[in-house]
């Protein structure tokens, strides 16, 4: 099966890099699925979104992302997020607590919702 190079990077660190067969992400234009050979595109990631990567060996990598961009060429996908957390590293109970206690803090709510969704999709 055809493969592409994918990098998932947050401002403070690289979360994952490798070969993949599929990337799906939530953008401001809607959800996008990218396979090898996709037309070039640049998309803006939603606040509190989820990115899912199917690796070349069939593993599924899921991350909560908060803002940033998705850049696609025929052979590469780069996800540059303002902040991101792999689903396996998320404390879902802490995220739910933030949702319960955040009041009017819309940014905290968006980040917490993205974290909960990432764990649910993993």
From Swiss-Prot:
Q: What InterPro entries does the record point to? A: ATP_synth_F1_dsu/esu, ATP_synth_F1_dsu/esu_N, ATPsynth_dsu/esu_N
* Main location per the UniProt record: membrane
Question: What SUPFAM superfamilies has UniProt attached to this entry?
Answer: Epsilon subunit of F1F0-ATP synthase N-terminal domain (SSF51344)
CDD domains from the UniProt entry? F1-ATPase_delta
* A UniProt-annotated Pfam family: ATP-synt_DE_N
Where's it found, cell-wise?
Cell membrane
Membrane topology of this protein? Peripheral membrane protein
Record GO cellular component, one term: proton-transporting ATP synthase complex
Keywords, A to Z, come to: ATP synthesis, Cell membrane, CF(1), Hydrogen ion transport, Ion transport, Membrane, Transport
UniProt GO molecular function: ATP binding; proton-transporting ATP synthase activity, rotational mechanism
Provide the function of this protein.
Produces ATP from ADP in the presence of a proton gradient across the membrane.
Q: How does it assemble?
A: F-type ATPases have 2 components, CF(1) - the catalytic core - and CF(0) - the membrane proton channel. CF(1) has five subunits: alpha(3), beta(3), gamma(1), delta(1), epsilon(1). CF(0) has three main subunits: a, b and c.
Concerning its family, UniProt says: Belongs to the ATPase epsilon chain family.
Q: What is this protein called?
A: ATP synthase epsilon chain
User: What is the source species?
Assistant: Rhodococcus opacus (strain B4)
**Which gene is transcribed and translated to give this protein?**
atpC
């Amino acid at each position: 099966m055809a493969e592409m190079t994918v990098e998932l990077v947050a401002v403070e660190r690289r979360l994952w890099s490798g070969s993949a067969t599929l990337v799906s992400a939530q953008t401001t234009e809607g959800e996008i699925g990218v396979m090898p050979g996709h037309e070039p595109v640049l998309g803006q990631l939603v606040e509190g979104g989820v990115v899912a990567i199917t690796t070349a060996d069939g593993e599924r990598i899921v991350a909560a992302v908060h803002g940033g961009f998705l850049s696609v060429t025929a052979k590469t996908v780069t996800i540059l997020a303002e902040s991101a957390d792999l689903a396996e590293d998320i404390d879902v109970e802490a995220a739910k607590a933030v949702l319960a206690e955040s009041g009017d803090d819309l940014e905290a709510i968006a980040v917490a919702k993205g974290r909960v969704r990432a764990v649910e999709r993993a």
